[in-house]
Amino acid sequence: MIAHLTGLVGQMESDRCVVDVGGVGYLVHASTRTLSALPRPPDVTRVLVETVVREDAFLLYGFAEAAERDWFRLLTTVQGVGAKVALAILSALSPGDLAGVIAAADKASLTRVSGVGARLAERILTELRDKAGRMPAGPGVTIAAPPASGGVEADALLALAGLGFRRAEAQPVVGRILARLDGKADLDVVIRESLRELAR
């Protein structure tokens, strides 16, 4: 199994990037938090990797810090939490915030995450309640997305800045997208749509 990759940062999207190691490009899925922490292409980076082998695919999930990787592993032990949902949770909540949410049984914070309904949030809280206290909090900076559109806008701009876009060029695009979606889109949707427009 692959434990980490060290190489050149290549193409970046809202939920993945390419890491070029010795001329081989590895497609690495990651949270917006990890993508924001990576240097701009084509700088060198090192990402921790969790390898997931499925019947039809061999997938790599990358993390800027060990705490996020460990939480990814723990989250995916919960029935109904696949890799995509785990990354969505880790995009919205830092490891420290997630530990706090579980300790406080804060279901509302979990249900704000795309793909997490009330029933799944309850299952996460129940199954991880006794394990969360032993998990690393990590040094990550909180960029959780609150339900108000102002918070989504600020977090989207932070993520886009981490992907190399200047605030001056990203802010009008994010504003238009939020207006078009009536301010109700979640963070992942706003980042994805913004990248689509900025790439034109």
From Swiss-Prot:
GO MF term (any one): ATP binding
A GO CC annotation given for this chain: Holliday junction helicase complex
Residue numbers spanned by region Flexible linker: 144-147
Pfam families: HHH_5, RuvA_C, RuvA_N
Main location: cytoplasm
GO BP annotations, alphabetical order: DNA recombination; DNA repair
Matches recorded under SMART domains: HhH1
Family: Belongs to the RuvA family.
Subunit structure: Homotetramer. Forms an RuvA(8)-RuvB(12)-Holliday junction (HJ) complex. HJ DNA is sandwiched between 2 RuvA tetramers; dsDNA enters through RuvA and exits via RuvB. An RuvB hexamer assembles on each DNA strand where it exits the tetramer. Each RuvB hexamer is contacted by two RuvA subunits (via domain III) on 2 adjacent RuvB subunits; this complex drives branch migration. In the full resolvosome a probable DNA-RuvA(4)-RuvB(12)-RuvC(2) complex forms which resolves the HJ.
Recorded domain comment: Has three domains with a flexible linker between the domains II and III and assumes an 'L' shape. Domain III is highly mobile and contacts RuvB.
Identification of the protein by name: Holliday junction branch migration complex subunit RuvA
Organism: Gluconacetobacter diazotrophicus (strain ATCC 49037 / DSM 5601 / CCUG 37298 / CIP 103539 / LMG 7603 / PAl5)
